[in-house]
Amino acid sequence: MRCPYCSSEDSQVKDSRPAEDGNAIRRRRICPDCGGRFTTFERVQLRELMIIKKTGRKVPFDRDKLLRSFEIALRKRPVDRDRIERAVSGIVRRLESSGETEIPSEEIGLQVLEALKSLDDVAFVRYASVYRDFSHAEDFEKVIAEISAKIARDPSE
């Protein structure tokens, strides 16, 4: 694998271990040329997914972009990286096993909202504000009222 620091074609695997509940392999690598250390992940890809944007344009599915969406919504929130990875992997697994190769971006957005709802209420509101294009304070109040009602019904969450 190419070194991200010096672009050398050689790198050595120093450690491999299962990750994401056995759905991936995490590899620690070192570059013999510059000494740079980096981590790679190997995952099974069942099929090539295409995302249909709101404009109708089709783009290849990008797992890293999905992960970044979670990271942005969860920035400075007390959620373990492991839980984020599991949520992302779960969404990817559902998309790949759906049988569809073209998936509307709205469907992914709904799955992200559902996952964030169980991870962190603040992150859910952050993501919903962008995804649902909030333009007024009332939009925030409505979502917060929904969350408050859910907490009142089940205080353990």
UniProtKB/Swiss-Prot annotation:
PROSITE patterns: ATP_CONE. It holds the Pfam family Zn_ribbon_NrdR. Residues 1-21 are annotated as: Disordered. Keywords: ATP-binding, DNA-binding, Metal-binding, Nucleotide-binding, Repressor, Transcription, Transcription regulation, Zinc, Zinc-finger. Binds 1 zinc ion. Residues 49-139 form the ATP-cone domain. A zinc finger (unnamed) spans 3-34. GO terms for biological process: negative regulation of DNA-templated transcription. GO terms for molecular function: ATP binding; DNA binding; zinc ion binding. It comes from the Bacteria. Its cofactor is Zn(2+). Residues 11-21 have a biased composition (Basic and acidic residues). Belongs to the NrdR family. Negatively regulates transcription of bacterial ribonucleotide reductase nrd genes and operons by binding to NrdR-boxes. NCBIfam families: transcriptional regulator NrdR. This is Transcriptional repressor NrdR. It comes from Sinorhizobium fredii (strain NBRC 101917 / NGR234).
